[in-house]
Structure formats: C-alpha cells, structure tokens
Design a protein with these regions (language model features):
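Outer-membrane pore/translocation modules
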Residues: 1-176, 197-200, 211-212
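Histidine-bearing beta->alpha loop at or near hydrolase active sites
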Residues: 203
Length: 225
C-alpha cells in the first residue's frame, strides 16, 4: 500500500471512513453537505506475490487458502454532495409519523489527496479479463425513512415500531446496471432497539464490493445525536 492511510491501518476495523464536510442548513427543514472523504478496509495485500504468500500461509495452517482474500487492500478518496429533508407531518395525511428523504452522490477519485490512486479490484485476484471500478456499483444513493409516531406502540409502550427505511444504491457509471436495495425495520422492545434488515445487491464488503449477494439479519441499533 502506498498512501498515508495505508501505512497506518486501523486495528480490528473492516471499514474506515473519515470524512470532512461543510453543512448548509435552510429554513425548510433540509440541509446540504459538501464533503471530501476516504474509505478503506485497512488491509495490506496489493500485489499477487503478497497474496500468494498469505494464501500459502493459510494452507500451511490447514485453513482454506481463500481466506487470504480478507487481506486484500481496498481504498478510495471521494468528493460527495448530500441533501436531506425532513418533511412536515401533515405532508401525507394518512401518515402521522415523520418522513425523511436523503440523496447522496459520491464521485470516487482517480488520484486522491489521501489515498492516491484507488485500490480496487485487481485482475490477478481471479484471473479476470475486465476491470470492475467502484463507480459501476456505488456512488448514487437514495434513502427514504419513516419514523413512526407513538400510536404504533402496544402493551404500554413495551413494544413500539420506531423506523422503517428503504435504501437504494447504484453506480454513476452505467446507472441502474448494478443496483443494491436495503430494507430496515427498527423496533423498540422493552427498551432495546431491535433491527431487522434485508439486503440484495452489492457492497456488502469492501473486498468483494462487486459481488452480488442476498443477506438478512437481526441486530441492535444505537444512535447518538
């Protein structure tokens, strides 16, 4: 790896994403963010020799050599523009909760200030014959959140629906060719913010950002304001 962030990889982290941004608010409940960010996975393998060495190390330990893929380095710098708006409760009379829309554009840079040249898919990884730049799979994002009112609570507020969020992502090169959809439902059960989610598409992991997968899960969502 040959950049400032690559030399000091984050410990026990698979997605490192610092961003500097300027936020401009207005009186209509919306804001704009203009940012410069860096995203990486904190790994070090960036050539076939290092990959083969790691591969053989796993084999020598009687583990699958393919585990070496987890050490492949990924990193990008990008510029971004975000717009978010919280709509008045009475925008849709049939819904008495709060609706929030968010749009984001990230342009991944060919030579960033922090990363330098991007570290993305290498053809030596699987003998491929074509590039798979990140902008084919990511860069345009839209999310729609609905924050439920307290009317959606039962058993004396021991169970409440908190938030429903739909997220759609695609690349800005060949738009809508590679799409990712995520649906999340957050509830509050006895004070615990339990989240159910399902995802279909790309970017489930920075190493394999170009692989199409379907996944779902259950977790806890803690948000600090």
């Amino acid at each position: 790896m040959n950049s400032l962030f690559s030399a000091a990889s984050p410990v026990a982290s698979r997605r490192f994403n610092p961003e500097f941004f300027l936020r401009i608010r207005n009186q209509t409940g919306s804001y704009w963010d203009f940012g410069y960010g860096h995203e990486s996975n904190g790994q070090q393998i960036d050539n076939p020799e290092a990959y083969e060495q790691e591969f053989q190390s796993y084999v020598a330990d009687n583990q699958p050599g393919i585990f070496a893929r987890d050490g492949i380095s990924r990193g990008w710098d990008y510029v971004s523009v975000d717009w978010e708006k919280q709509w008045p409760v009475d925008t849709l009379p049939i819904l008495d909760g709060t609706t929030v829309t968010h749009f984001e554009f990230r342009r991944f840079l060919s030579n960033g200030l922090l990363q330098g040249r991007p570290e993305e898919y290498y053809q030596w990884e699987d003998g491929g014959d074509r590039d798979r730049p990140r902008q084919l799979y990511d860069g345009l994002n839209m999310s729609l959140q609905y924050l439920f009112s307290r009317r959606y609570c039962t058993s004396g507020e021991n169970f409440c629906l908190e938030k429903l969020e739909l997220n759609q992502t695609t690349g800005y090169r060949d738009i809508l060719e590679h799409n990712t959809s995520t649906l999340e439902l957050t509830t509050n059960i006895l004070g615990l913010p339990l989240q159910l989610w399902a995802k279909s598409g790309y970017n489930s992991d920075l190493v394999d950002y170009y692989d199409y997968t379907n996944s779902w899960g259950i977790g806890l969502e803690f948000v600090s304001n």
